[in-house]
Amino acid sequence: HGVGNVANAVLAGLMDSPFERMAAYTEVIQDGMLDLLDAGKLTVASATAFSLSPEAAADLNSRMSQFQGKIILRPQEISNHPELIRRLGCIAMNGLIEADIYGAVNSTQVMGSRIQNGIGGSGDFARNAFISCFVTPSTAKDGRISAIVPMASHVDHITQDVQVIVTEQG
């Protein structure tokens, strides 16, 4: 599961889904996962770290006992271990900056040269998950820049590691 606004939007969408008793095996726990744990949709979340808004962090700290047994923090060597990801049959969800028509994904650099963020564990999950999904808005900069391009300006995830790309257009 990736980090960011799009990932939290997908997690929010799971709140109204027919899916129940889900488990999250991820690198980072975000606001949306706490909401799913509260609602009982998610039974457990295993991760290496938190990436929470100040409000969600304060809420977690004030109700930590309610999350006992539902949140497991593990070393990165375990949470991102390729064999564990593969054995668990994870459905990986990561964000992207751009993807090309061949399925190559750029997760780190804007316009091919300005670093936006690091690759994190997305490579571990993309390559080893049962299903590797990348989610993104179809455009950036008020619709002036397409996230789906003829050829990615930089490639972090090769075509063979990417199975599904989803935008709000489909």
Where do the protein language model's features map onto the residues?
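Conserved phosphate- and dinucleotide-binding cores of soluble alpha/beta proteins
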Residues: H1-Q169
